[in-house]
From Swiss-Prot:
GO terms for molecular function: metal ion binding. It holds the Pfam family Metallothio_2. InterPro entries: Metalthion_15p (IPR000347). Belongs to the metallothionein superfamily. Type 15 family. The gene is MT1B. Metallothioneins have a high content of cysteine residues that bind various heavy metals. This is Metallothionein-like protein 1. Keywords: Metal-binding, Metal-thiolate cluster. It comes from the Eukaryota. It comes from Trifolium repens (Creeping white clover).
């Protein structure tokens, strides 16, 4: 059973675990990179964030806000 429904009612289905910790098939990986540039001027610190989420039961459906698909790309 696919957890993603497409069309006007696109949502991530029963397996939607948006903004919740769950054990099982869903995982979220976050990476933060800090760059310090030193030179003639004052020190500048730059932060870059990258976040990746995968839900195995959602057929490539990525949960957005309010458990909606972002984008709705069900197959």
């Amino acid at each position: 059973m696919s957890g993603c429904n497409c069309g006007s009612s696109c949502n991530c289905g029963d397996s939607c675990k948006c903004n919740k910790r769950s054990s099982g098939l869903n995982y979220v990986e976050a990476e933060t990179t800090e760059t310090v540039i030193l030179g003639v001027g004052p020190a500048k610190i730059q932060f870059e964030d990258a976040e990746m989420g995968v839900a195995a039961e959602d057929s490539g459906c990525k949960c957005g806000s309010s458990c909606t698909c972002d984008p709705c790309n069900c197959k």
